[in-house]
Every structure is written in structure tokens, then in C-alpha cells.
Amino acid sequence: MLGLNNRFRAASILSRQLFVHLTLLFLSWLAVPPSALQAQQIRLPSAKGGVADLSAKQQRRQGDLYIADGDVDLHYGDSRLQADHVEYNDKTSETIARGHVLYDYENQHLEADEVHYNVSTGRGSFRIVHGTIKIERRPNPTLLLSDNPLYFEAQEVERYPGDVYLVRHSWITICDPDHPQWQFYAASARIRLDKTVALVNANFRLFRVPLLWLPYATAPAGRKVRESGFLIPDVGQSSRKGFIFGDAFYWAPTSWLDTTVGAQYLSRRGASERGELRAKPFEDTSISYSYFGVDDRGLKDSTGVRQPQGGEQQRLEIDSKLPWGWRFVTDYNQLSSLTFRLAFADTFGEAINSEVRSAVFATNNFHGFSLNFAALNDKNFLTINPQTSVILRNLPEARFGSVEQNPWAKLPIYFGFDSFVDGVHRSDNLVDTPLTVSRTEFAPRVTIPLHIADWFGITGTAAFRTTRYGDSLNNAGQVGSVAITRNTGEFSIDLRPPTLERFFDRTSLRRDKNRRRYKHTIEPVVTYRYVTGVNNFADFIRFDSNATITDTNEIQYGFTQRLFLKEGDDQPRELLSWSIFQKHYFDPTFGGAIVNGQRNVFQALNSVTPFAFAFGPRNWSPIVSDIKLTPGGRYDVEQILQYDPHNHRLVTIGTLLKVKPYSEFFATIAHFRLDDNPSVSDVQPPSPLPAFQQPLSNQIRALAGYGSETRKGLNFITGIGYDFTNKTLQNQIVQASYNGGCCGIAFEYRRINLGQVRTENQFRIAFLIANIGTFGNLRHQEKIF
């Protein structure tokens, strides 16, 4: 009994002690002010009339100064300042923050030990800083872009209104700041958002190893920013040019004008100069000019004598929309010699282009009429040793014409016309005309379209053409001052028989698949054409296609088959097309225009194929077949075949295949073969094969790769150009690159083989810095072929 009472007394004592402790705890909780349990929040005035929101665990006021401690959070407009300790002056808006300071404004984030900042003006200073600034860049297919912000660390940062930062003793990168692949160390840097990043006394480091010192460097820091200054130097090696070193200066004085001027030192050749100007002074006017030249010492030949191949090329382009519907266009091109282009063109495709064309014209189209004034010049280089060329010039030229117009609404009769007046010139090894040969032409026409029911169409066109040339060729093929006139009558009938159609419905048995419907069509076409009145074809000087009109009596016939696919409610798309056509000539001599023993080129022939096939009288043209397979997606195929019934063989084979079998893989193959030389029977009377055979052609271009120039990860591309006839590898390229999140590296090997003029091996390397540019001599904007 005594033990039970003792246990009960002990339990009572414990209960009283617990009650006392709980009571004291409750009273102490009631004694704590609310401000001690949560952050104090107040609204403070600023110097410019704005309002700053301040919250902290503890804060007090001393005159104009508010002092806050503990999780301090200060908001003013779009800016935010967080710190352990903040002193704010509501008269001047000056703020001092210390301890774990965080500053945020739009896409700017800074962390510092101490900050002096004016919330009203946005000006401040930061000490012991690391931060990020998000810089938006405009998409660029030739520039590696990264979504990473600009990271930097600095001893001191000054911020100025207008989003301008002056950074001292800093490093800058867009890589992972803990493991940066590259960094810029700069004694001083200026960052102007949506403008530029400028570095003073900087050095570039790769994996923390200093590689390049720059006294001053700038880079764009916005979507539409152009910054004047020197570009990244160009360094490389070539088997024919030697060691290459160059640089260029970019100048953008206004928002509508920029220019680039640069030069390269070529240790084995001399020096090259480049220039480019772009301008858009008005909304509808654009101007561009480019120049490239080489002062070449030349390479030594087998006798030890240097053979210079230098020269220059330039191009001027102007496109402007003028008042009252006028448009003015200039495309002026100048090339000093084909040898220069073959020797110094950057790519194989540029090197083998032997044509230089220039045009200046003003045009106005109104109410179905067209008025044009032009100056044209076409120079085609033929050989390089000796250098020969053909020059064709139209200066000046005025043309006036109209489309078919119907003056009577109830009658299907349409009228139109073409006319021109110009001065023309031709210069080659055989013909050299005066500087200006006058020429005029007027050609009215009438067109009558007829429809038999709704399934058969007939369109007839009749035209009269009168043409006068101020000079002509005499019987010896020499230019004479005798004027010549041509009056031709032209008639054509275009027959459109009904299109044959058949539908195939392959309805899917699965409800989750779209219904597929196919349509197969056969479209026949027959065109008859008759031209008479060209009685002296050999007397006309070949200035352009106008001089190649001949008498003809011909019919062209053929058909086009198409296969369409319609999936669900989508629009139909063409999967396959196959066109076959041929011409029959009732007059095999074309009014006596055919010349035996030479290639004949005029309108009645080259309207079928661009390759000469008539070396004597012909009744039949080659049969032309054009097949296009375009299912979309993984592959596209086109093949052109030309079969000559006179020679009983395929004379032209052209094949183009584009494949994208999987993911980022792609391949393009183009093969072309031409064998259209005459047979013995082409020459009347039959004789051994003449010496006028046109060159054979059998070439292939192949390009395959994975990825793209600016894709993240591993990318590669390889291509060749091979000439089967000459058994020559004309062009070869191998390019491999790897792009990371903030940088990339690329290697390239090129070989260009142009016979005795140029056989060159090029080795290129580039280091790509995301959002900035490329170090090295590999320029992604260059075309491979």
C-alpha cells in the first residue's frame, strides 16, 4: 500500500512539472512580437518617385537610412537585390548590400560579396563577382550557337544605365564555368547588352592554356548587331600557295551599310586582296559589291621560269524598285582571265565556270504590256593557252511587248506582239563586228484557243516576224556592211487530247491509319510548228537565239504520266512523273540551213535538247525521257535519257539521287554521260569520221555525310568528283567536325585537279567558338561543289 502511494505521488509531481513548463512556453510565445516570427515588409519611397519593397527579418530606421538584416529582399521595378545586410537611403535611392549578395534584372544575374547600387538609376558597383548574362543571337547557319548564357568572374564590376557593364580583371566564357573548354582573360571588358562585348588586353585560353593575346577584341552581343573591327586572322597551308596568313577589317558605320576589306600573304605566290560592300540605303534598294585579286609572282615551270597566273574579278549588284512601277537591276561581272579563276578560285565549282555575264536593265510591266531598257554583255572563255573567248553584247536595247489580250469578250481571239530595237556586237576568232550593229524586229501574233466539249483542246497561233540586221556575213563568212532583212511567217497548233485517269483506293483496314488513294494520269500532247521565210540563214551573224531561227516543218509529240497520292484529308502530292517526247522534221535540211560536217545549233534543234545532235540532214530528233520519283522523305530520284534513233544508241544519261536513309545521314550522287558524236552516215557523202567531234563527257559527283556544320556532336562529310573519260579525280573533300555545347573543332582536306593549270592539296582546320565565330581558315559558308 505504501509503495502504491509513493508511485501515485511521483506521477502527480511529474504532471505538475509538465503543466508548468507548457504554461511558461505558451506565455513566452505570447510575449514574442509578430515581427520576430516573420520577415518585416515595408514599402519605401525612392528618389525618382518610384516605390521599393523591402523585406527582412530585422530592420530599423536611422534618419533617411533603413538598415535591414537577415534574408533581406529589396524589389524595385524589374530589379531585385538580396543580401544578408542592406542599407537603403530613401532620399537618394543609394543601397549598400553585403554578404551573399544576389542581383537579378531581366536576363542578368550577378552574385557578389559587396554591392553599392542605386535602384532609381540602375548604376552600381559590385566586388568579387561572378554572374551570368543571357545574350540572344540571331539564327545563323554558318555559326555555332549555344543557349548557354555568358559566364564571367571579376574582381570588380561597374554597372551603368542602359545595360552596360564594365568588368575589370575577369574571365569570360559560355562554357560550364566549373569545367570551361575555353576562356577569355581580360584586364578590362565592356558588355553592352544587345550591342557588343569588348575585351581589352585579353588572352584566349583553351583548357586553361594561353594560346592567343589580343590587345582589343569585340564580339556581337545581340540578335541584330554588327560591330566594326578586325576579324579573326586566317592561317593555313596549301601545296601551291604555301603558308597563308591574312586578316580583314569589318566596318559598319550605319545600320544600312557595311564593308569588309582584307588581304592574305601567300608565301609561294605573293598577296591577295578582298573587298566587299553591302548597302540598303532605302527600303526597296539594295547594293552589293565584291572584289578579289591576286598579285602573283607565279610558280616556276620545268625551265625555272616563273609563270604568273594573277588577275582580278569583281561583281556589282543593284536592285531597286522605282516610282511608277519601274524596277532597276544591275548585275555587273568582270574577270581578267580564265587562268586566274582556275588557279585561285576557292572551290571546284567556281573554278570551272567559264562564263562571265553582265546585265543592266530597267523594266516596267503594266496592263499586260512590258517595257524594258537593257545593256547586256556575255563573255565565254574557250581556251586558256592561247586565251580565246566569245563576246556577245547588246548595248543599248529597248524591248516592248504584250501578253495575249482579248479585245472581244465573246470571241476567243487573242492578240499580242514583241518588238525590240538594239545595237549588238560579237567578237571571237572568226567574227569581229563593228562596235554596234543596228537591229530591229516587230512580231505581232494572234492566238485562238478552241475546246471541243470539255475533253479536247486546240490552240492555234499565227505570227508574222520582220527583222532587220544592219550588217551581215558574206559568202566567205566575213562581216560586211550589207543590211539584211528577214520576213517570216510562223504557225503552230497545240493539240491537247483528253487526259486519261484511273483511281486506286487502298483503304486501310486499321482505323488508326489514314485512307490512301492513288491517281494515275496519262497526258498526251501534240504540237505542230511551221516557219517559212528564212531564205538566207547563213548570212545572219549569231548574236543570240534570235539569229538562229530557221525554216522548219515539224511536229512534236509525247506524253507525261503522273502518279498522285492522297492520304486522308491532305492535299494530293505527286509521287512519280515520266515524260517522253520526240520531234519529227518533215524538212530535214531546215530550208537549207543544215551544214554537213559540223555541229548545227539553232532553235528547231535545241528546243528538244541542249546538246548538238545534227551533223547533217535529220528527220528525227533524239527521244527524250525524263523520270522523276519524289515520294518525299528518304529519297528523290531523277533520270534523263536521250536515245538517238539515227545512231541507234543512248547519247545522254543523267542521273540524280538524293538519299536520307536514317537520322542525320545523307547522300547525293549525280552522274552524267554524253556520247553524241556523229556516225559516218551523218556526213554526205559518207566519209571517215570528221575532226569536228564534240568532247565526250562521263563524270560523277558524289557527296555523303552525317549531321550538319553547326549540329551538336560528331559530323562528317566526304565528296568526290571523278572524270571517267580522262580517268582523273577532279575534286575531293573530307571534312570532320565535333561540336560541343560551347565550342567545336573541324578538320578538312581538299584536292582540286585542273590539269596543268592547277593541282592543289589544301589542309584546313578551324576552332569554333559558340556565338562568337571561328578561328582558322575553314569557312563553312563556302560551297563544297
Residue spans for each PLM region:
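Bacterial N-terminal signal peptides
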Residues: 17-33
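Boundary at the C-terminal end of the N-terminal hydrophobic targeting segment
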Residues: 37-39
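Extended, small-residue-rich solenoid/repeat segments and analogous flexible loops
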Residues: 41-48, 243, 629
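Interaction modules related to DNA damage response and DNA replication/repair
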Residues: 42-47, 53-56, 69-85, 98-112, ...
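Structural recognition of beta-strand segments within beta-rich domains
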Residues: 60-82, 87-98, 102-104, 109, ...
